[in-house]
């Protein structure tokens, strides 16, 4: 606010609380905290605040002060006005609605005008039960002059309305500025939501979910349906969000509406109604920025209140039609062959896309994080041991699971955890609208870039080795391709599922899977060779190698490059194989392979199975112990790797995992490289 706007009679906002700070002072308000620096600023503000009542002009406040102190007062008042902490004139709000006016004064320069707009708004309340009744009272007491309560399901004979009337247009007042829906059933809320959206009327939902009440606004950019679908991604027991063929809004509401809320007592009902009423006030008056894409959760037993942000969900009535879809869906060309111009545009955009800034990944990824409504619930160290490696975990939604990342620093570990989380989520985020009639999506042959249909069950498989999220498209595809090569190399050489536990018995026991040396000839790489490869790989690999030496881990590295001739090394501890890594060069496998060995040892020594690596087929005991040390395999180009796969009947296809456009916008390079066996 310009200085001249408050020079008349400055008044400090009623929600401002002054507290000292080591470097000056803080003013804590409903809108956040404002900081003022300076050795004496807290003393100045403390002395000045009692006089900023809106009754005295700046000239009157400074008339008896020396010029230097008068100038300081004017500068402080100007700073307060510029930050919206001081209003121009008038006493603090008072009267029967001083609470509402006081709240609005925190967000509006003219709280009275905002409150008048609120009073003039028509509000319809849909629902029955104790919470609906209490909320109706709260809204009337807050100053709303036009609140109508609709009790669906009571029947016309009792003066009510029949189920389904809202969707028929008989219930919804087209003049309403807001509909408030109170229910225990998300399916009922969805029916109300869609009816209101069709009529262009915003709706505030209060939906009970177990021992919680979730409240949020839907309309315009905001979508309660999106928020609820995000919530359901964390709660496998959440009620399905699908309305019946003939929505019976009243039946669900009248039957048990808010009985659960009432069971927690009258005080809980009162708090829940007050919360919903406050959000109505904030929405109608635009008192708070950022209510879009948020839901507020009231935990009914404890009355703890938290606000959660969500990204728009791709499966909702508000989701836009995808720009790129597989032809062969309804209205397309049968056969599931992708539209060539659209496919070419899509692939070109991925290839030409800017790499994700690693330093900015923390800020960009924050939009995906929320404990209840996020794509990722948390990224943290969870009390894991942080030596020798830093280990971070990310919780992933839809369905809930845990992924981890490790590295030499906490930031590096978190980056890898976020990438793993995005890959895992993207591999389960399937939009039915983007499948063709046969349930397929579009992939791209790595051999020639030609689009091919891929079964959705194959493309969206979070356990597949080729599921990767990277910082750029080329890197993600390459990582997915090489992970498939490692799986093929180890898997194709696997003999029986397990070794017999008892000599002379042909029944396989539950022991580890062993590789058949007839198909794979492990060649031992001595420490000197490993050191040379690590030096070629870079500082990270060398650091891992030094850690293994300090910990006296009996590292074993074998060249297991098979018929594909893609450099593949097996990394282990003694006779135990920990993992297989393929690369374009043998040196390219060292960083991931040595990190896997360290992670295995850290998990084992600290008894922390969360980040333990999955079992892999085992090399035979003392593999490659004879014949001397081997030279590392020859390097290959990516084109040679693809050609080798095709020559052996393995056709690699890259499928972009981009069905959630919000996640794709933040981290666009998630892919599953699948192998089509011809």
Regions flagged by a language model, labelled:
Residues 140-176:
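A short, well-structured beta->alpha microelement
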Residues 287-504, 514-678:
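Helix-biased "structured C-terminal domain" signature
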Residues 162-165, 175-274, 285, 301:
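E1/E1-like adenylate-forming module used to activate ubiquitin-like modifiers
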Residues 1-33:
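Long, low-complexity, charged/polar intrinsically disordered regions in eukaryotic proteins
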Residues 61, 139, 196, 277-280, ...:
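Hydrophobic structural packing positions in well-ordered secondary structure
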Residues 31-147, 523, 531:
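Long, charge-rich, low-complexity alpha-helical segments
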Residues 52, 81, 269, 273-289, ...:
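Short, hydrophobic alpha-helical segments
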Residues 125-134, 151-154, 180-186, 206-209:
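Structural motif
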